[in-house]
């Protein structure tokens, strides 16, 4: 029996290994045909997780017995059993792996994502359950910080949460969440990609990590005349100019408007402690907008390779 299961698993793996991606496109009906049930989804997870070979987490043994139920593998030496989802961001999903796949698909392939309330109604789960898994997907969307922006880059800051009475300009004591944002433009001035960091205040110390993490020292950076950028200009090529509404920084203001509108109309309210995840989600989609056909393949691999995170590691009480 185990021999037959091993042969079946080897066949599935060889078929998976020969594929350039597990799914291409944005058609939800075709997506469901590719992943028709929980078992097929677990098989794809197992083959991605162990694509470079199996190694027992306890004793490093490389031989195993395969169990089709939950796609488990049992070490032949210490008998440690490990499921396909163990140690991944799919770990602990009890509402159905296929539903989890569909939620991840919608978060990546739709233009504006969806709210946890919408996902809960659509897939017959609680809002709390959908929110928790969607936060896991957002963790997987975090930038690798390996590909700094080059060429023409615009940088600015904004607040999330609307205006406060008596607050004008950059108010350090504002209770609203503050964000520093950078956008790379194409040669003809169109938006290419971008990143954003939640910041504590508008000081150079708070803003500079955005430069260090996401902008090349060779980039031609344009900012407004805020004093913090004068300090950062000591190590980056920055040109400062006065911000004139409707005249300059149009691309940056377009991005800021989209982020604020998305949070207000789709998410309704986002706590400051979770805001970075929503920014990561927005720019994950934006930065791959010309590669939409392969975007699920990318997020799937990230969900499998990212270490498991539990409820206490994700929830922020603020």
Pin down the residues of each PLM region.
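Residue-level recognition of single "structural anchor" positions
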Residues: 2-318
